[in-house]
Amino acid sequence: RRVLFRSVCNRTIKKHTVSKLYTEVNTIPSNNVGLLLGTSPKLKSGNNNLYFDYRILATVELYKAGKIKYILISGDNRKEDYNEPEEMKKALMQKGIPEKSIYLDYAGFRTLDSVVRAKEVFGQNRLTIISQRFHNERAIYLAEKNGIDAIGYNAQNVNAYAGLKTNIRELLARVKMFIDLGMDKQPHFLGEKI
């Protein structure tokens, strides 16, 4: 039963999001805001996190092509020495993105938080979500269920061997997402509108 439920969750998400995913900058529609989903620049081993690097490159590509005007970086900063939004902001600025085009959401602890807060706190009803395809699929599905018109720009993925742990984690995250939606789970912090 568990395997069947995981399979149904996975197929449902893929079916509902396939037409909203883009890999080519010249074919993606423009939106004012790109929601960049956070991750750490380094792995626990100390090596560079390719998920981070590829998301930064995808965001720069969209911005420089005029497909987004502003970037909302949503990520975790619960620990003093761990700040996904600030690290991503630094990386974007090093690639020539002006600071005035970057906004930070420090309470994007989970994809649910990032997506819902983009609407409820930052007032966005239309978004281009930027992450790897597997993550974009889930984020777009969450956006739809929360009344947000979202498309996704797929950053390059990490090779299957390096991303095996992430892919397994993603299958479980999809199941949890359906449970959260069924229970009307809200972000950890909602806060005042900005």
Model-found features: residue ranges?
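Short, small-residue-biased leader/transition segments that mark boundaries at the very start
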Residues: 3-4
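A transmembrane-helix-recognition feature enriched in membrane-embedded lipid enzymes
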Residues: 164-186
